[in-house]
Amino acid sequence: MVMVRITRVHTGGGDAGETSLVDGSRVSKSDDRIEIVGTCDEVNALLGLVLMETSRLPDNHPDGGARTTVRRVKDVCLAALGRMQSELFDLGAELACPPDQIPEYMQLVDQEDSDRLCEEMDAWNEELEPLESFILPTGSGPIAAMHLARTV
């Protein structure tokens, strides 16, 4: 895979309300594609927050007993969330290309990736008790961060 080297985080080229796509062409910052790229970036940052908050949770109770739920989240969900972050990054890069000019080296998010995500959500949902009401967005740091990510 070819990595793009970013030498600075701003160019000043967007000051007139336009931004550049991967091929250098210019589009309005209000273009739907740019909105979606921004949403991918926002969800990606929020998943990073979930990962950071989850990594802070202790594996054991103060009495020394195992916290099996925390360990399960760390073992199963963190790997999936990390993969989702990579896929969101890939999706944002793909969206920042004109459809007919996607570089061959670019990693694309495909139907298999989408199907895997749906299968994971279905499997996780099977483990939950049936919901009888809406869930208030409260709880520990990882839970609050996940609620925030869910709203984007």
Where are the model-predicted features located?
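Phosphate/pyrophosphate-binding loop motifs in nucleotide- or prenyl diphosphate-using proteins
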Residues: 1-152
